[in-house]
Amino acid sequence: MEDDVAALVVDNGSGMCKAGFAGDDAPRAVFPSIVGRPRHQGVMVGMGQKDSYVGDEAQSKRGILTLKYPIEHGIVTNWDDMEKIWHHTFYNELRVAPEEHPVLLTEAPLNPKANREKMTQIMFETFNSPAMYVAIQAVLSLYASGRTTGIVLDSGDGVSHTVPIYEGYALPHAILRLDLAGRDLTDYLMKILTERGYSFTTTAEREIVRDIKEKLCYVALDFEQEMATAASSSSLEKSYELPDGQVITIGNERFRCPESLFQPSFLGMESTGVHETTYNSIMKCDIDIRKDLYANTVLSGGTTMFPGIADRMQKEITALAPSTMKIKIIAPPERKYSVWIGGSILASLSTFQQMWISKQEYDESGPSIVHRKCF
């Protein structure tokens, strides 16, 4: 690869797509992973109506569109729409010619083999990429924290995973997936705010609730005690001004919402919380590496951005682990984008340049080359 051509780094999440150039310290473009199509033909007369809209434009025109998320629970389920998102990423957001830049894509842990092949095929055949690579999201987050061994709790909008990684390689047998993430927390907050007498139901109102969640929610260190405090005083109450000027007050909902990460029963789910899932993941690993995982537990993704989450994880894992074990939870301030940042670091390493799958290799071997070169 020529050094003067910057590689592109594209992290496709269930909720947001993060894209930019290798070597940068933050993504240039962050937009919703949505594709919208007009509900009725010819509604927007003379507006040069497009047959589809992507990202923020789809979001702002949602009143006349049917919105679809092509990535569900971290896995691409609609390739036509996914192709539209990539097209939008290259041509509209980054304004680059994809045939001129190597591209690093990210994938969910345990992504099906056929999916990795399909991603590879689209990059080479549709976008004519000179070279590409597919990396596991959690592994990139670990790199971004300056480690090669540890366990990553990666929680985004559509899915959460606990991924133990040893010397740069994810251990597939010990990866656990939890279908509980940001979108579920937003839904739950909508529900409990309705119980307080506020009504949030439409997609537009859902965006407001997501904003309330991001600005006001936090994780309690001791849930029962926090509930008692909230009941006996108004010290935990905060007010929030809605776009129409109405002011609402939110109390114990602030910590009841993210508490579902630790008690999924709040959402009517029978699964274990994020702390127990992390512990179970560690216990599926060889006894000799557990110590390294406990001491390097890295939080990643937007749903780990709640204040108080690291202290609570520390407390919960300490309670589950052997009493002499040293436990360290690492919560980097930039963890919302650490997958992308890890990709930016990886793709700009001189030692990585031989790892790219080149167009030539693809032409010789076909899509299955991805399993030999990316692991």
Swiss-Prot record:
Among InterPro entries, the record links this protein to:
Actin (IPR004000), Actin/actin-like_CS (IPR020902), Actin_CS (IPR004001), ATPase_NBD (IPR043129)
Give the matching Gene3D superfamilies: 3.30.420.40, Actin, Chain A, domain 4
As its record notes, the protein acts as a catalyst of: ATP + H2O = ADP + phosphate + H(+)
* Protein keywords: Acetylation, ATP-binding, Cytoplasm, Cytoskeleton, Hydrolase, Nucleotide-binding
**N-acetylglutamate occurs at which residues?**
2
Its signal peptide is none
Source domain of life is: Eukaryota
Coiled-coil region? none
Record family assignment: Belongs to the actin family.
Identification of the protein by name = Actin, cytoplasmic
